[in-house]
Amino acid sequence: MPKKKEDSQKTLSEKEAKGLIAKLSDEIRHHQYLYYVKNDPKISDFDFDQLFRRLQDLEEEFPQFKDLASPTLVVGSDLDKDFEKFQHKLPVLSLINTYNDNELLEWVNKTDPEGLYSVEWKIDGASIVLYYENGILKNGVTRGSGGIGDDVTDNIRTIRNIPLRLPKPITVYLRGEVFMTFKDFEEFNALSSGKYANPRNLSAGSIKQKNSSDTAKRPLRIFTYDATFPNMEKKFKTHQEIFSKLEKLTFPVPPNTAFVSGSKIAKTIQEFKKQKDSLGFPTDGLVIKLNDISKRDALGYTSHSPRWARAYKFDAIMKESKIVDITYAVGRTGKITPRAEIEPISLAGTTVTFATLHNQDYIDELGVGIGAIVRVAKRGEIIPAVEEVVTPGKEVFKIPDRCPSCNTQTIKKESLVDLFCPNPDCPDRVKNGIIFYCQRKQMDIEGLGDKQIEFLYDHDYIKSIADLYDLKDQKEKLMEEEGFGEKSVNIILKGIEQSKQKDFRFLLPSLGLSELGHKVTELLIEHGIDSIDEILSIAKDQKKIESLLEIPGIGPSTIQAFQENFSDKRILKLIERLKKAGLKMKADPIQVADQQPFAGQSWCVTGSFENFQPRDKAMDLIVYYGGRKVSAVSSKTTHLLAGPGAGSKLEKANELGVSVYDEKQFLDLLKSLKIDFKNLI
């Protein structure tokens, strides 16, 4: 149990206190530099806050040693010498963090116990300030020191959900957070050989690219969460009014923001925690703000933060364990990733027995070895990772120089720290390539999970993606295998057959070719390169290949990969076999947005469904045909698709007069629109 402040500090002499304040100040500045400038934090938010609070307590106890450059008086800085500096028009402050309900409720009771508060997601991304003048985006600026930031306007303009022109010619300054969804991060990181640790680091690095065309290739998004309207005569009375105004101006805001009384904050926090794992974007907590603007003004600010808001950080998901072994996995690209087998720990609600070690450089930097006591965290809430060594093992682990799957000599690719297996026939590479092809977000072949694919490969049923389409010829033999009864085999074969109807825009990125993911595929299709014949024709003509550079979002690395992919005899043979199997080699035409059946409609989906598992499949279908996805029912929602377990969303939809469809009615609607949903989901 931690000591109370008076127990831990009053025993210090003035000389000791002065020295400790100086030491803590230097340590905090160092970690602020690593976090804000290098995007490479070495300690958790929780540990940083403990250092910060310790310094605050000491300065309160020994005010004679607090100087004007104390970290407690200034905001951490992300200033970079490579960008023009911009003087913020208002101070850009940070928030005081709280880590438990009691601490937060103590603040609420002291601030305004009966007042109304907003509870909104704290996005784990890169902080940005947007400056609009007369409705035009003039500047996008990092938080910087809080007074001066880096002008990254050209990079910010590439973010697709940031409006460059507003519906009205007004002047407004906005705070926002640039982020990347988990799905987009995984796809981008896969194309980048997994070199990025988490979405936050990638987002922060992306807005600091020297060339905005590089930023444009990255699937960045933004949520805005506060605004100042300097020239508006009518002042807003509440934060809720500001949020409403932001939405009317087409700014994206954090979903499901709640406005509740102080007495309901604890219950609301628990409700938010239940939603956290299904959000799809990184969050490290909640932000609680007093709703009444006049009360905010009365409370005011410290030099570091507003007195009317707090950040509620979720439990620090980092625990200690012992490394019992270190193994390494070979991915579909050949990248060899070491991972630590650890004594089981519970982390973020799951039992963790493995944690990634990324690469040899990472192992060397931390000094990781078998037998070490380490701290493990969920990095970006995706993959558990070893974060630091508490007690070293016997010796630092070295990855062998031969592939663990096929014994081929490993290589290092230019500018990458990872080791790769160069053998395209490496069993683990092939298996993981087939697993990738069958995943839901790729060709979505039902019944074929990792274990089934590994079995089929190891027992010589399949040795490539194309072999899947010959599996029907071995149906009788397969049904005799343990775990493969007639029912499960029929499901697998049906899934394989249905995949033949998947649009070419899914097929091409599912092949796992370097630099040819969903985003690049869509860019090609948008510019008329919508078939394999067109792609192969371009690949044979150097001038046509170079002309691809004219497409925004396609750069030299994509061009190089394009040439390499479509001159590779193995890939050409695979494409030819898939052609013969009957897969679609030309993209289906997409209707003009305002001609699509769900154009102009806002749909919310809730409950469970027989034909749409998971229910995201129903939403994907609606969006594919022009509808807009919303996560909560409001007066702007036009339709609700409700299955069993719909709960409060159904009640609210009925109250607001929103059109409600159950699954049967929705299927009838699809039928009337002549939408064959089974070939699309």
From Swiss-Prot:
Domain called BRCT: residue spans: 593-681
Question: Which GO terms fall under biological process for this protein?
Answer: DNA repair; DNA replication
According to its UniProt entry, this protein's organism is Leptospira interrogans serogroup Icterohaemorrhagiae serovar Lai (strain 56601)
Q: Does the keyword rRNA processing apply?
A: no
Tell me its family: Belongs to the NAD-dependent DNA ligase family. LigA subfamily.
Q: Which reaction does it catalyse?
A: NAD(+) + (deoxyribonucleotide)n-3'-hydroxyl + 5'-phospho-(deoxyribonucleotide)m = (deoxyribonucleotide)n+m + AMP + beta-nicotinamide D-nucleotide
Q: Which UniProt keywords are present, listed alphabetically?
A: DNA damage, DNA repair, DNA replication, Ligase, Magnesium, Manganese, Metal-binding, NAD, Zinc
Taxonomic lineage is: Bacteria, Pseudomonadati, Spirochaetota, Spirochaetia, Leptospirales
Q: Which cofactor does it need?
A: Mg(2+); Mn(2+)
Q: Active site: which residues?
A: K122
Gene3D superfamilies assigned to the protein according to its UniProt record, in alphabetical order: 5' to 3' exonuclease, C-terminal subdomain, 6.20.10.30, BRCT domain, DNA ligase/mRNA capping enzyme, Helix hairpin bin, Nucleic acid-binding proteins
For the keyword NAD, the answer is yes
- Any idea what this protein is called? DNA ligase
Q: Name one GO cellular component term.
A: cytosol
Q: What is its EC number?
A: 6.5.1.2
- Residues recorded as binding Zn(2+), renumbered to this chain, are C403, C406, C421, C426
- Mind telling me which InterPro entries this protein's record contains? BRCT_dom (IPR001357), BRCT_dom_sf (IPR036420), DNA_ligase (IPR001679), DNAligase_adenylation (IPR013839), DNAligase_N (IPR013840), NA-bd_OB-fold (IPR012340), NAD_DNA_ligase_OB (IPR004150), RuvA_2-like (IPR010994)
